[in-house]
Amino acid sequence: RGNQLKFFQEREPIPITENFPLIKFLGGSIKKGRLEIMLHGYDHQYKINPDLTRIPEFIWRSDLESRVRKGQTILKDALGVNVTSFVPPSNAIGQRGLKAITKARLNLLGVTGTRSLMRVNPVNLGYALTSRLNKSYPYNVREFVGHKQLMCRSLAPRSNWLRLLSDFEECRKKEGVFIVATHYWESKSKHDTEKRTITDLLLNLIEKANDSGATFVGVEEAFAKEKS
């Protein structure tokens, strides 16, 4: 899917089970403990409006519960893993999507508004208020009915690099959890304002974290690290 000219938004999604080299690479890396597998939507398909604006999959789709189940099954069959975390396509998730991952008991890489949480389960209001009292807020693990949430920052060519560094510094002072998401096909792309590659910026951020004494853990361990 990284070759956007050839594969981006194809009409028929191609299951990961048909990509044998990728399955082999991922399987070996999982055994070595080098990576974790998360569910990132089902096919990442956008709805294109007449004005050409794009609506992300977990906003516009109505069959999200079945899509989550099918996605979990595909990853289980392909890699032998039971995924526990969900990353919304385009970092966007609506109320239906939130209900779907809650039912599947998948933790969310991202945060949602209190109103959506309450519509899924009114008890979530109490959890949301409690989370705000955490010393690490907003960089703490937020626990709700059926799932947890962790804030996730994006590093892409158009990301605000100075804001990302500022957020990292705030997180460091609060001893919170800092997660950065990026795309492998953008690794060699230059940042719009910094004029350095995304790889260079990511390595710079990792170096800053290492120098500050940060502990590097996987997402699953981060979710288990604390309670809000």
Where on the chain are the PLM-derived regions?
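Acidic/glycine-enriched edge-of-secondary-structure segments
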Residues: V141-L162
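Catalytic alpha-helical scaffold of carbohydrate-active enzymes acting on polysaccharides/glycoconjugates
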Residues: R1-S85, N91-R142, W161-V180, H191-S228
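Short acidic, S/G/P-rich loop/turn micro-motifs used as interaction or catalytic elements
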Residues: W185-S189
